[in-house]
Amino acid sequence: MNFRKILTITLLSFSFAVYQVGDQISQGDQDRVFEVCYGAEHHGIEPVGGRYNLTLGDYNGFTNDTGIFYVLMIDMAASWWGPCWNNIGTMVGIEGYYEDNPNVKIITNLDDIGQPYSCQQWGDRHQFYNPDVFPLMTDDGNQDVLWSWLNTGG
């Protein structure tokens, strides 16, 4: 009986997201700034006020300065969750597969950084698998922003 309750609560948590598959992300949410905590310099992101930032709008040809549209894959990872840590090798393979396609961008969005792994440790683990692939990582700031937007149960 308890298993059913837990399963029901878990499944319901996935239904309360801002965006569902096929939804257009609002301009306000596209403009929300996320701190890049790893890989900015390898992805052409310039610091602003000493910080590296990105927005989802940076990859939208209607709103960015280049007019180029990108396919954006966002890997959602929690630093405390073992399966996310173990998934790094798979992500490196995906990143390596698309690294020569300038219109595909892959971002790892980290939540709960420092519990136990830092952004630097996460990036270094990527580099361990393939030193030629530089991941791009953002810090969700323990606010569960992207987690709640994209139906991950955050």
State each model region's role.
Residues 84-88, 118-121, 148-149:
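Short, solvent-exposed loop/turn and secondary-structure capping segments
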Residues 18-36:
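Boundary/junction segments of secreted and surface-exposed precursor proteins
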Residues 68-92, 113-115:
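Conserved redox-active cysteine motifs that mediate thiol-disulfide chemistry
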Residues 3-15:
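Sec-dependent N-terminal signal peptides
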Residues 72-76, 104-110, 134-138:
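Structural recognition of the beta-strand scaffold that forms the well-ordered cores
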Residues 31-72, 93:
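A short beta-strand-turn-helix
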Residues 121-154:
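Short, internal strand/loop/helix patches
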Residues 110-116, 140-142:
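Short beta-alpha junction loops
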